[in-house]
Amino acid sequence: MELSHLALVCAAIAFSSIFVVSQAGITSTHARVSEPSEEMSLETFPPPAGYNAPEQVHITQGDNAGRAMIISWVMPLNEDGSNVVTYWIASSDGSDNKNAIATTSSYRYFNYTSGYLHHATIKKLEYDPSKSRSRCSLHIRYYSDLGQTYASNQTLYNYMSNPKGQAVLFVGDLSYADDHPNHDQRKWDSYGRFVEPSAAYQPWSWAAGNYEIDYAQSISETQPFKPYKNRYHVPYKASQSTSPLWYSIKRASTYIIVLSSYSAYDKYTPQNSWLQDELKKVNRSETSWLIVLVHAPWYNSNNYHYMEGESMRVTFEPWFVENKVDIVFAGHVHAYERSKRISNIHYNITDGMSTPVKDQNAPIYITIGDGGNIEGIANSFTDPQPSYSAFREASFGHALLEIKNRTHAHYTWHRNKEDEAVIADSIWLKKRYYLPEEETA
């Protein structure tokens, strides 16, 4: 299992660019048309040929420390042996085979019954490279609001065409099944087949978005997150979480915290208590970079979903500044935006207002809800551009975070342009914990 790089796919598509520069930042006038993206049909991703063939294979980190992997797949029949994963050390001749036995389940949703969902955890894996975690470089890609449209396909193609990156962090809104009548669960199956060419070979980790809730009282489906929780397992118990909707993992020199925008988070709630304890566990001499994933953005200058993350921001932002979180990735808004390092935690006694101010101990907030979903682009930014916004564009695309060492990382966002990705935004990042200094593009 490689921990040498960490890459980050954020999602976008567009044409030629013009930039409007203000004291606030850059608003790119390069915008993709806002009409909904055309969704690929169910027939685009048929079940694989062969008797009881496994499908929708995906892998995710299986513990907090990175020494385990969860292998997940779906099969139409639950036969003997169909729940076993055989594995061995890559450098061996295969004679030291080991088996991992999967848990098996199936779920019903309205008039749909899933195939047999298997999740097997393989443990005691070796790090590659086997060197100090704090010195490891890392590339992670981030997606959000992907769906399964032709625009989504371009985003995934561009990501897979880039040789960098060994992991994906997905910031919510996967299949968009609930955009269809009765939350058509077949769209969960087609989505699993769609992303399998990547998700079966590189570990994906997920945050849950609003489209994972799948709450439909009109058809008596009142268990939130039922399809998502059954299909996508995460190692939440390894970080002492009580829910798969919030958890943490360590990957090379990075500590990654996943939060839930759609679960209770106020004082005395399980998520609040867990995060308070979790931040105390972060050892910056071991994992120098601290990254948070949350679906609804806290800083967003788009009219779509404006201020939806405000109550969560008020609850947790002081902790993020105190603990010098480096980056917060969000989705939800179907556009791209990067903030400056700002905080809004101090009350102004003069005018009674609380406004964002420059703060070198604060995170950069990046919205990457631009994966290519069926609903199209959110192309209505507020005017003028607020002072906290550094760059924004109404397009689809992907991004790459290259963590070079314990103090420096390079971030790029690539808009989709026809059959290639073009770098539209970039910045060198300096670790908040060691170098709380101004950063440059």
Curated annotation (Swiss-Prot):
Q: Which reaction does it catalyse?
A: a phosphate monoester + H2O = an alcohol + phosphate
Record: residues binding Zn(2+):
D173, N210, H295, H332
Q: Where is the signal peptide?
A: 1-24
Binding-site residues for substrate, renumbered to this chain = N210, H332, V333, H334
A GO CC annotation given for this chain: extracellular region
Q: In which tissues is it expressed?
A: Specifically expressed in flowers.
Query: Pfam families annotated for this entry?
Result: Metallophos, Metallophos_C, Pur_ac_phosph_N
Instruction: Give the induction note.
Output: By phosphate deprivation.
Annotated EC: 3.1.3.2
Principal location = secreted
Enumerate the active-site residues: H305
The record's GO molecular-function terms, alphabetically, read:
acid phosphatase activity; metal ion binding
Enumerate the SUPFAM superfamilies for this protein: Metallo-dependent phosphatases (SSF56300), Purple acid phosphatase, N-terminal domain (SSF49363)
Cofactor annotation remark:
Binds 1 Fe cation per subunit. Binds 1 zinc ion per subunit.
Q: Is Transit peptide among the key words of this record?
A: no
Q: What is this protein called?
A: Purple acid phosphatase 11
Query: What organism does the record attribute this protein to?
Result: Arabidopsis thaliana
Gene encoding this chain? PAP11
